[in-house]
UniProtKB/Swiss-Prot annotation:
SUPFAM superfamilies: Cyclin-like (SSF47954). Disruption phenotype: Null mutants are viable, but grow more slowly than wild-type cells at 30 degrees Celsius. They are cold-sensitive, failing to grow at 12 degrees Celsius. They display flocculent growth in liquid media and they show abnormal cell morphologies, for example, a significant fraction of the cells are greatly enlarged. Deletion mutant is sensitive to the DNA synthesis inhibitor hydroxyurea (HU) and UV irradiation. This is CTD kinase subunit beta. Phosphorylated. Ubiquitinated. Phosphorylation and ubiquitination lead to degradation in growth-related way by the ubiquitin-proteasome pathway. Neither phosphorylation nor degradation requires association with CTK1. Keywords: Cyclin, DNA damage, mRNA processing, Nucleus, Phosphoprotein, Transcription, Ubl conjugation. Signal peptide: none annotated. It is found in: Nucleus, Nucleolus. Cyclin subunit of the CTDK-I complex, which hyperphosphorylates the C-terminal heptapeptide repeat domain (CTD) of the largest RNA polymerase II subunit. CTDK-I phosphorylates 'Ser-5' if the CTD substrate is not phosphorylated at 'Ser-5', but will phosphorylate 'Ser-2' of a CTD substrate if 'Ser-5' is already phosphorylated. CTDK-I is also more reactive toward substrates that are prephosphorylated at 'Ser-2' or 'Ser-5' compared with an unphosphorylated CTD substrate, therefore efficiently creating doubly phosphorylated CTD repeats. It holds the Pfam family Cyclin_N. It comes from Saccharomyces cerevisiae (strain ATCC 204508 / S288c) (Baker's yeast).
Length: 323
């Protein structure tokens, strides 16, 4: 009887549509409200870690991206979410080259969670769990380093703002908004430069500027649909969850207070919501990438960045079967 070798091949998809994300989460998240509440708590936890370890915001952004990608393909469990978050941060440090000893990160992580007596055994056991989760995080991203390897949202805000000759006041406001944007799943949907443009547009309008030009989008290799998707995500967040935002607590000193009414006005002036086209149900439910629960007992899983490799292997397998 011939032996069989089970193998899976995945094509990297660093960005997914909202409906694809929701479909993937059906397999991993039983209570989305609980997940979202805990995600905001984890975001604060990661922010506190980054502040105390003096990490730049790009490290936080990378860790948050990893955390949300992880839970697309791995079950959300309340009791281990802070361990997952710590693992995301240690991996994020390597990704964006903000190097810090794992001991320092793990020790501070335990302290922030009120672990009183941190001895060598507790620290080493925690580090083992953190390292074990790293592989799952990398697999959830298909080992694709392109997303977090280059320029990040806050950096794009400054670079694009300077390119468009926006003043310090506008860019500073946009930089604060960019922090709140990290709390959303938008970073799983839209590339960083498109999110940065949407944030600049919001800051531009909050300062009562008129006639924002969509002609700018082609200059920065994006399009109106992508920018609108991020724009409405962020505006809706401020309308629906203004009490959870950091903008109201960190508003630049030279600006008048901004309330939820201001964002409702922006949405009204923007007209009907628009954004990226959504995938129909029949295609969504036929997509194994998001519908099939990942089996960690499979003997081999491989990840590629090019469809040509998948098509080439399919052709070889087909030829072998018919030989």
């Amino acid at each position: 009887m011939p032996s069989t070798f089970e193998s899976q091949l995945f094509f990297s998809r660093p960005f997914l549509s909202k409906r694809q994300i929701q479909r993937a989460q059906k397999n991993t998240i039983s209570d989305y409200r609980n997940y979202n509440q805990k995600k905001l708590a984890v975001f604060k936890f990661l922010s506190d870690l980054c502040v105390q370890l003096k990490f730049p915001r790009k490290t936080l952004e990378t860790a948050v991206y990893f955390y949300q990608r992880y839970h697309l393909f791995n079950r959300f469990e309340t009791e281990v979410c802070y361990t997952v978050a710590t693992s995301c941060l240690t991996l994020g440090c390597k990704e964006v080259e903000t190097i810090k000893k794992t001991n320092d990160i793990c020790t501070l992580s335990l302290r922030l969670r009120n672990v009183v007596k941190i001895n060598t055994d507790i620290l080493e056991n925690f580090k083992k769990r953190v390292f074990q989760i790293e592989l799952r995080i990398l697999e959830s991203c298909s080992f694709d380093y392109r997303v977090n390897n280059y320029v990040h949202i806050d950096e794009y805000v400054i670079k694009i703002g300077r390119e468009l000759s926006f003043d310090y006041k506008l860019c500073n406001l946009a930089w604060v908004i960019a922090y709140d944007a990290l709390k959303l799943e938008t970073i799983l949907v839209i590339p960083q430069h498109s999110i940065a443009l949407a944030i600049l547009k919001i800051a531009y309008e909050l300062l009562d500027n008129k006639n924002w030009s969509s002609k700018r989008y082609s200059l920065f290799e994006t399009d109106e649909k992508s920018v609108n998707e991020a724009y409405f995500d962020i505006v809706n967040f401020y309308i629906n969850s203004f009490d959870m935002c950091d903008l109201q607590r960190h508003l630049p000193a030279d600006l008048l207070p901004i309330g939820v009414e201001r964002f409702m006005e922006l949405k009204k002036n923007a007209g009907p919501e628009s954004g990226l086209p959504q995938i129909p149900d029949h295609l969504l439910n036929a997509d194994p990438y998001i519908t099939i629960t990942r089996d960690n007992n499979v003997q081999e899983r491989r990840y590629v960045l090019s469809l040509e490799l998948i098509n080439g292997e399919s052709s070889i397998n087909s030829s072998t079967r018919h030989a």
